[in-house]
Each structure stands twice: as structure tokens, then as C-alpha cells.
Amino acid sequence: MRTLQILVGLLAGAGLLAAGPARAQSALGPYLFAGLGYDQMPDRNLTINGRPGVSSQWKPGYGLAAGVGYKWFFGLRTEAEYSGRVSWVKTFNNTNPWAGTAWDNSVMMNALYDFEFDSPVTPFIGGGLGLNQIQWGNNFRVPTQNPPTIYDGESIRPGWQGIAGLSLAVTPQIAVAVDGRVKGSFGHFNFAGSVPGKSINQFNYETRSIFVSVRYFFGGQP
């Protein structure tokens, strides 16, 4: 949260400096965007080898996002977005060390609303629906077990995300934005172990991210 406060402060300060006579706002019409993010998955519950109620802890990760959008005249923006996230498992039940990598590859259709106040700084909120592919790999295992049971695997579930942030129109064609996201899946993910009869089930995926992005608008004046 400290990182988000710093980014929002910088963006707001830049908006005050940019709020000159032109008072730039983003152009209407199509745009491209790309961003880089910090990702932190909170503790997630799962069932391992028939034992329910096990919690998993995760190290901080990162994310990438890119896509195309359209800015409508009444504050609505619609987007088609691809995003990818990477995180690393740390422990189960805060005590047992684990090793392995989790990847989230997602395609989302987003709808967002810009609160426009004749200012280059614009708050926005929105959300999206799509598909999440969750993949575990790099020998997802207990590293102290010899030989280990490997839980590598992947599957796809419907996904959702909520978004809130601020954007700064540097010019009508270029804007930068910072936003916070909560993202998850409908349903659970299951991973079969390399040893018959062993598996991880009922993994409920949800994560939190902070993204900084750049938008390029192809339209003229707003």
C-alpha cells in the first residue's frame, strides 16, 4: 500500500504541474495501452492429498498487461486486455517450505468509467470478465522431500477483476495511469501429483496488483 500511495502522490503532483491553460484531456476514440505491475497473492486455501483447510503463502511477483481500448464521449471506456502474472510459492500453513512458480495468463473484456472534471487528472473505476489460465511449474513441490511429489499442471477457469485508479493526460494522445486491481477466478483449480493418488485441489485463485501503464490515443482533440 505504501507503493500505491507514493505513485498516486506523484501522479497527482504531475497533474497539478500539467494543469496549465491547455488543460489536456485524453482524446476520444481507439487507443493502445501497456503496463507493468507489482503483484501480491494473499494467503489462499486449498486441499492437499485429501486434507482440507491448508493455507498457502506466496512471495511478491510481477505482472504485465497490454491491449486495445475505445474511449466513448460520455466517460465510458471499453478494453480487450491480455495480462500475465508470475508469483512464487513460499510456505504452506506459514511453516512448511515449498518451492515452485505460478503463472496467470488472462484475457479480459473490461468496462471502465472516467470521472472527468475538466482536468488532466481523471479518476476511474471499472471491472472485467474473461478467462484465467493458472499454471504451476518449475517442479512445484516440498523441496525437503526426497523424492518429491511434483504438482505441476494447468487449467482454465472464468475470471473477473475490479479496477480503480487515476490517469494523467500528458497530451490528448498520451496518458499515464496507476491503478489497483483485485483479480480472481470463478471456481477452483486442481493439480494432480506425480505420485498416483496425491493431488492439490480446491485452490481458490485471487490476487492483488498495482499497475502503471501508458495509453496512446489515435483520435484528435477530446
Annotated model-derived regions:
Residues 1-28, 219-222:
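Cleavable N-terminal export/targeting peptides
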Residues 20, 29, 119-122, 157, ...:
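Hydrophobic alpha-helix-in-membranes signature
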Residues 25-29, 36-44, 67-143, 205-222:
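Gram-negative (and chloroplast) outer-membrane scaffold detector with strong preference
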Residues 33-67:
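N-terminal targeting signals for Sec/Tat export/insertion, comprising classic cleavable signal peptides
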Residues 87, 171-222:
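Predominantly the C-terminal beta-signal and adjacent terminal strand-loop region
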Residues 107-109, 125-131, 155-166, 180-182:
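Hydrophobic alpha-helical segments of small multi-pass membrane proteins
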